[in-house]
Amino acid sequence: MLDAFSRVVTNADAKAAYVGGADLQALKKFISEGNKRLDAVNSVVSNASCIVSDAVSGMICENPSLISPSGNCYTNRRMAACLRDGEIILRYVSYALLSGDSSVLEDRCLNGLKETYSSLGVPANSNARAVSIMKACAVAFINNTASQRKLSTPQGDCSGLASECASYFDKVTAAIS
């Protein structure tokens, strides 16, 4: 995983060049939006349990066969595993959002995830739907539009960070579909 600073230095070093120009401007922008980024991550992690439980509940409401005796969420153990997996995915999305880099998500969470779920017989469409619900919830919390919870956030537009967060969830959906 490379943060924004390490990425710039690594790229400049590979070119045997000084850090400057567009790279410095990108870092300046990253720093100036630092408080918003921290608040965005905080809004997601502060509501992680709510986001994950809403996603799993929504997935089950749309596909009640998941909790039937032959379903993938039947028994407390399987339901707990489903919630745990949602928490892990959300945690790695929050790491990516914090660092502004998806490599931690890709390397430590998504690598081999589809194959694991396939071998366990987990339906990809239900999984993708739960991730889609988590994405909508996280974006709502970042934009401070979640109906039940309003946080104090710095003034300004957070739509860029919400869009960045959404792109990380899109990577998860693509990896498991």
UniProtKB/Swiss-Prot annotation:
Alphabetic keyword roster: Bile pigment, Chloroplast, Chromophore, Electron transport, Membrane, Methylation, Photosynthesis, Plastid, Thylakoid, Transport
Record-linked InterPro entries: Globin-like_sf, Phycobilisome_asu/bsu, Phycobilisome_asu/bsu_sf
Main location: plastid
Signal peptide from the UniProt entry: none
Record: residues binding (2R,3E)-phycoerythrobilin 1: 50, 61
Positions bound to (2R,3E)-phycoerythrobilin 3: 158
Keyword Plastid attributed: yes
Domain of life: Eukaryota
Keyword Plastid among record annotations: yes
GO CC field: chloroplast thylakoid membrane; phycobilisome
Pfam families noted in UniProt: Phycobilisome (PF00502)
UniProt modified residues of type N4-methylasparagine: 72
Residues reported to bind (2R,3E)-phycoerythrobilin 2: 82
Compartments, as annotated in UniProt: Plastid, Chloroplast thylakoid membrane
Other comment: The light-harvesting system in Cryptophytes contains phycobiliprotein complexes. Unusually they are composed of either phycoerythrin (CPE) or phycocyanin (CPC) but never allophycocyanin (APC), with only one type of biliprotein being present in any one species. Unlike cyanobacteria or red algae these proteins are not arranged into higher-order phycobilisome complexes, and they are found in the thylakoid lumen.
Subunit composition and interactions: Heterotetramer of one alpha-1, one alpha-2, and two beta chains.
Function in brief: Light-harvesting photosynthetic bile pigment-protein from the phycobiliprotein complex.
Name of protein: B-phycoerythrin beta chain
Organism from which the protein derives: Guillardia theta
Lineage start: Eukaryota, Cryptophyceae, Pyrenomonadales, Geminigeraceae, Guillardia
